[in-house]
């Protein structure tokens, strides 16, 4: 029933608006359907998946790349060295932007954009969990349009055209956010407690590399949290106001794969871990086009409120989803 109650107010901001308050400029599902007489379904141009998919970087065309990273696990497990070496084989110079925090901040984004403006890359590569990829998407916007502010792009579909300076490659290491295939990025202003839910097909990555070997490094707790994030994406996409014959099969198959593999993945089964990496990507394709619902509204608001004691977004979803369904 709650989904029916909230349909008229479901935000194009994929449920990231404050509960009970739809920010000026957000668009209801009914308005979107009126606008989208001819609907749109958008995915990355290329998606490479499976064992050794990371080696695709050897064939990438470009001159300079920035590699955006999180807390250090990708370097610790040797993936950063691999990426730098593959890019070197392709004749590409690489600069690292490291230390992107969970739920990335406005300050982190602006610092990264400044690095890009000085280095002038024609490739932006983000590797890690959802946070470094989300942050890199926002950096991309401010790299290509330095005059832009967050206020300029906070409303849906207000990001100016990209790809004049760089193309974007996303390489996920966790199996939950699926930001490697979505049109969304969430950036937090901790001074105000505001989360900026950037939503525009412009920030859909050009290339996604879904290599299961990166997900094998996840600890158990992160496996559980990201798995519940993926399950919530799939369920909400399936009942979303903008679901379609294109998004439904992706959502359904993702739900089935997650039910079949999440527990085994949590227990250390690497085949199941690889299946979860694919399932979360399918869920991302679904929700990027169908949008989400009230579970994510609640989860993102919680994340902004409790910034001093970080609650993983997937854990928030796990807490709320049963109550919302009931």
Model-derived regions, located:
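Gly/Pro-rich interdomain helix-loop hinge
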Residues: 304-326
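Carboxylate- and glycine-rich phosphate/diphosphate-binding segment that chelates Mg2+/Mn2+
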Residues: 184-290
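ATP/NTP phosphate-donor binding region
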Residues: 27-123
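Short hydrophobic alpha-helical segments enriched in small aliphatic residues
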Residues: 5-7, 19
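Glycine/threonine-rich beta-strand-loop-alpha-helix active-site module
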Residues: 107-213
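Glycine-rich phosphate-binding loop
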Residues: 123-134, 292, 297-306
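Methionine residue identity
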Residues: 1-2
């Amino acid at each position: 029933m709650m989904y029916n109650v909230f349909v008229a107010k479901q935000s194009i901001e994929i449920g990231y608006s404050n509960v009970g308050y739809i920010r000026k400029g957000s668009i209801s599902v009914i308005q979107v359907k009126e606008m989208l007489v001819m609907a749109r379904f958008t995915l990355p141009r290329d998606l490479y998946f499976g064992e050794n998919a990371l080696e695709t970087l050897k064939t990438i065309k470009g001159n300079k790349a920035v590699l955006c990273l999180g807390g250090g696990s990708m370097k610790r497990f040797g993936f950063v060295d691999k990426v730098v070496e593959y890019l070197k084989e392709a004749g590409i110079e690489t600069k690292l932007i490291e230390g992107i925090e969970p739920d990335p901040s406005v300050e982190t984004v602006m610092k990264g954009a400044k690095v890009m403006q000085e280095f002038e890359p024609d490739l932006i590569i983000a590797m890690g969990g959802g946070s470094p990829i989300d942050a890199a998407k926002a950096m991309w916007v401010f790299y290509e349009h330095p005059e832009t502010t967050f206020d300029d792009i906070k409303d849906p579909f207000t990001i100016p055209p990209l790809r004049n300076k760089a193309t974007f490659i996303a390489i996920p290491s966790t199996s939950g956010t699926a930001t490697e295939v979505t049109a969304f990025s969430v950036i937090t202003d901790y001074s105000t407690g505001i989360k900026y839910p950037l939503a525009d097909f412009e920030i859909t990555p050009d290339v996604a590399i879904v290599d299961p070997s990166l997900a094998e490094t996840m600890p158990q707790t992160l496996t559980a949290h990201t798995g519940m994030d993926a399950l919530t994406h799939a369920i909400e996409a399936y009942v979303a106001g903008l679901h379609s014959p294109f998004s439904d099969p992706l959502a359904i198959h993702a739900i089935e794969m997650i039910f079949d593999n999440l527990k085994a993945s949590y227990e250390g089964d690497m085949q199941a871990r690889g299946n979860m990496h694919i399932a979360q990507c399918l869920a991302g394709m679904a929700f990027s086009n169908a949008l989400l619902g009230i579970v994510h509204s609640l989860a993102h608001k919680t994340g902004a409120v409790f910034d001093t004691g970080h609650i993983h977004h997937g854990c928030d979803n796990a807490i709320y989803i049963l109550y919302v369904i009931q």
